[in-house]
Amino acid sequence: IVKTIFMSPSPCIKIEFQGGDPSTDFEMVKYIIEEAEWQNLFKKRELEFVICTNLTLLNEKMVKYLKKHNCMISTSLDGPKDLHDTNRPLQNKNLDHHAIFEKKLQMIRGIWGDDECASALMTTSKYSLGRFKDIIDEYIRLGFHNIFLRALNPYGFAKQHKDKIAYPIEDFVKNYKEGLDYIIELNKKGTFFVEGYAALLLRRILTPFATGFVDLQSPAGVGIAGAIYDYDGSVYVADEGRMMARFKNYYFRLGN
């Protein structure tokens, strides 16, 4: 897979580890990072790494390794404790997911010495509606300077559990407007905070520069701006294609 990744003509290559949670097989993460770095001695690309994890399994040794290899951390934060734990329950019901998240985040930032080493994304379930202000406040409390208010994608497990977590898109738009208004007011009062989707749209509208955001590219950036390599070697044009394959729809699989 790493050899195939370097067949890309792009001068910049970013390898992002997704899941499940890739920290459950951290030895494989290490192998891929080190193999990519070795191949890049000859390929001479601008090489970056990102690992997507809920942080629960990360320990100091892992984080020090990630820092050494400049592998950034992307995680999930859905809001205050009650909302985050509702959206993302752990198998062990006796564990406090949000408390673990906050403790691990502090540990990561302490090792890196930089708050920007870890970024967070939220998922908007029906339990999130009406609570965008609380969610934004929680991001600020935990030291994040931006949020990406995004609707639920109707693919994969989200589609499977739509009766529990889905909502009309009109409800999301209403909440998004309220959330964006709140963020604008925060900035007016001196708290720097960015709504990521609005920033992408405004950059496209007001400047001649591209954003690299595949969903907004025309023609579509799938299979061009990136490719998804699954655990079995299957290659998809986008993450949504991989999610659809979980339910036996292989339309967006490029090959194996």
What is each PLM-predicted segment?
Residues 14-19, 86:
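Short acidic, glycine/Ser/Thr-rich loop/turn "cap" segments at secondary-structure junctions
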Residues 2, 7-16, 50, 233:
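N-terminal pre-triad scaffold of radical SAM enzymes
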Residues 82-102, 106, 110-235, 240-252:
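Radical SAM enzyme [4Fe-4S]-AdoMet core and its adjacent flexible, acidic
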Residues 6, 66-67, 140:
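Non-catalytic positions within long, well-ordered alpha-helices that form the structural scaffold/packing
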Residues 1, 22-86, 90-103, 107, ...:
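Canonical radical SAM enzyme core domain
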Residues 4-9, 37-44, 109-114, 184-190:
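Alpha-helix termini
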Residues 12-16, 46-50, 72-74, 117-121, ...:
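Structural preference for beta-strand elements that scaffold enzyme active sites
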